[in-house]
Amino acid sequence: MSVDISTVKRVAHLARIAVSEEDAERMTGELNAILGFVEQLNEVDVEGIEPMTSVTPMKMRMREDKVTDGGIAAAVVANAPVTEDNFFVVPKVVE
């Protein structure tokens, strides 16, 4: 798959990004290089290879789940203009 300048402009338009003509030409080359690398990765034989979740063989340390109030309710509502019992108070918007 290769990207041409019209594809770059179309994607930029869809993303609502302003792209100049010279930037679009530069991006065309960069995107084609990226897609070429991805195509190389698709050719790698990974049959029998276990998926990795980390590059190190460490296991995640587990801790016991404890239900708490978090202890920061007052800090969370500290900058709110109006609060009541550590809750935000907002104007009624639905009748």
Swiss-Prot record:
Catalysed reaction, written as an equation: L-glutamyl-tRNA(Gln) + L-glutamine + ATP + H2O = L-glutaminyl-tRNA(Gln) + L-glutamate + ADP + phosphate + H(+); L-aspartyl-tRNA(Asn) + L-glutamine + ATP + H2O = L-asparaginyl-tRNA(Asn) + L-glutamate + ADP + phosphate + 2 H(+)
EC number: 6.3.5.-
InterPro entries xref list: Asp/Glu-ADT_sf_sub_c (IPR036113), GatC (IPR003837)
Keywords: ATP-binding, Ligase, Nucleotide-binding, Protein biosynthesis
A single GO molecular function term of this UniProt record: ATP binding
Pfam families listed in its UniProt record: GatC
Domain of life (superkingdom): Bacteria
GO biological process, one term: regulation of translational fidelity
Uppermost EC category: ligase
Assembly information from the UniProt record: Heterotrimer of A, B and C subunits.
Similarity field: Belongs to the GatC family.
Function: Allows the formation of correctly charged Asn-tRNA(Asn) or Gln-tRNA(Gln) through the transamidation of misacylated Asp-tRNA(Asn) or Glu-tRNA(Gln) in organisms which lack either or both of asparaginyl-tRNA or glutaminyl-tRNA synthetases. The reaction takes place in the presence of glutamine and ATP through an activated phospho-Asp-tRNA(Asn) or phospho-Glu-tRNA(Gln).
Protein name per Swiss-Prot or TrEMBL: Aspartyl/glutamyl-tRNA(Asn/Gln) amidotransferase subunit C
The species this protein was found in: Brucella melitensis biotype 2 (strain ATCC 23457)
